From Swiss-Prot:
Residues 243-390 form the Helicase C-terminal domain. One of its GO terms (molecular function) is ATP hydrolysis activity. The keyword Chloroplast does not apply. Pfam families: DEAD, Helicase_C. The keyword Cytoplasm applies. ATP binds at residues 53-60. It catalyses: ATP + H2O = ADP + phosphate + H(+). This is ATP-dependent RNA helicase RhlB. Residues 40-219 form the Helicase ATP-binding domain.
Length: 432
């Protein structure tokens, strides 16, 4: 993590439980990020907060540290039963819930607190078996949590800490009725530590906070610009005919360490996967139709470096928190301005540099003026030499074909390879 992304506040200087400090030290957390430095002193006084912070700012560790510390320093309710978690963390997507649980397990190692996770798309009974053994901190999506509450599998009568993450996305996805349902089944707000985090503290988000929290203090870490200065943005104006060849040429030129390619439709994503796979890239496909187990496997492969490229729709990519994404390619400009910010925000995180490349094609170029107005600046235009685009592109792979997951860059088999390192190919020349 870049030091410029951190504050001067040390975790060790905060009044945290010794076991929390030990877990932070073991995982390399010494200095707080700005949102952690602002929110933890408030939360450690058992005061509620409504925090405004973008993804990639460290807000997840902020509320996890506060949650673990609160449970370790506050006695559990005397009448608590095995099916009653002490803390609940609600997330808008299963991918975000999985990431939160992964981070929570880093802190749970020395505390004796049990972490459980529930979300749709996975076996109801398998997740129930975990709950039946008892969990202290329950992480999940609202729909699956409600299922277990209604079935009497869990009770929220002993909740002592509540986290609502990405509240603005909860509104976007229509989950607010679910959230209010769950809040009404918890102890009074005055007997809980309540935390809400959102990229924007709109009036509807603030109303939710004040309805179900105890006079929360507003904590804001708002960037001066909607897009990070760490991200180099550029845009091309390709013809429909050139669009795919331009993407493949740029990806060969950039040779990104880890890239996400966004498109607006499932069909377009499948087409992109076919061409990228045919060209020898190690690529995963993430659309709404991909089964949950396969989604998890693809994300694990992408995170570990077994896949270099992820092709995704906006809906399928919501809630993803993957570090070290070097490049984002907007094959289609999104129809929603906020989606542009969310897309390119996958790179340039935690103080790292990132690159965003967008295509303003004949179909989606009309989306650009609204996007530029929303982000407050023009995206620099880059030009390409049509004659320099790749002309030896292999045939795309059919989507139903089972493709190998063990492919590597060196020695990968493809129509343009004869084995060994990738041979040199024509490249576009872009202005520096």
């Amino acid at each position: 993590m870049s030091e410029t992304h951190l504050s001067t506040q040390r975790f060790a200087d905060l009044p945290l439980h010794a076991e929390v400090i030990q877990a932070l030290n073991e995982n390399g957390f010494e200095f707080c990020t700005p949102i952690q430095a602002l929110s933890l002193p408030v939360l450690l006084k058992a005061k509620d907060i409504a925090g405004q912070a973008q993804t990639g700012t460290g807000k997840t560790m902020a509320f996890l540290v506060a949650t673990f510390n609160h449970l370790l320093t506050t006695p559990a309710p005397q009448a608590r039963e095995l099916n009653q978690p002490r803390a609940i963390i609600m997330a808008p997507t299963r991918e975000l819930a999985i990431q939160i649980a992964k981070d929570a397990n880093l802190l749970a190692k020395h505390t004796g607190l049990k972490v459980g996770i529930v979300y749709g798309g996975e076996s109801y009974e398998v997740q129930r078996e975990v709950l039946d053994k008892g969990v202290d901190i329950l992480i999940g999506t609202t729909g699956r949590i409600i299922d277990y509450v209604r079935q009497g599998v869990i009770s929220l009568n002993s909740i002592q800490a509540v986290v609502l993450d990405e509240a603005d996305r909860m509104f976007d996805l229509g989950f607010i009725k679910d959230i209010r349902f769950l809040f009404r089944r918890m102890p009074d707000a005055s007997s809980r530590l309540n935390m809400l985090f959102s990229a924007t503290l709109s009036m509807k988000v603030q109303e939710l906070a004040y309805d179900h929290m105890n006079d929360p203090e507003k904590v804001e870490v708002t960037p001066e610009e909607k897009t990070s200065k760490n991200i180099k943005e550029e845009i091309f104006y390709p013809s429909t005919e050139d669009k795919m060849r331009l993407l493949l040429t740029l990806m060969e030129e950039d040779w990104p360490e880890k890239a996400i390619v966004f498109s607006n439709t499932k069909h377009s994503c499948e087409n992109l996967w076919s061409w990228l796979e045919g060209d020898g890239h190690r690529v995963g496909l993430l659309t709404g139709d991909v089964p949950q187990k396969k989604r998890i496997r693809i994300l694990e492969q992408f995170t570990s470096g077994d896949l270099d490229v992820l092709v995704a729709t906006d809906v399928a990519a919501r809630g993803l928190h993957i570090s070290d994404v070097s490049h984002v390619y907007n094959y289609d400009l999104p129809d929603d301005c906020e989606d542009y910010v969310h897309r390119i925000g996958r790179t340039g995180r935690a103080g790292n540099k990132g690159v965003s490349v967008s295509f303003a094609c004949e179909t989606y170029a009309l989306n650009l003026p609204a996007i530029e107005q929303y982000i407050g600046h023009s995206v620099p235009v880059s030009r390409y030499d049509r004659e320099a685009l790749l002309d030896d592109i292999p045939t795309p792979v059919k989507i139903h074909r089972k493709h190998p997951t063990s492919r590597t860059r060196d020695g990968a088999k493809g129509a343009h390879r004869s084995g060994g390192a990738r041979p040199p190919r024509h490249r576009t020349r872009r202005p520096s």
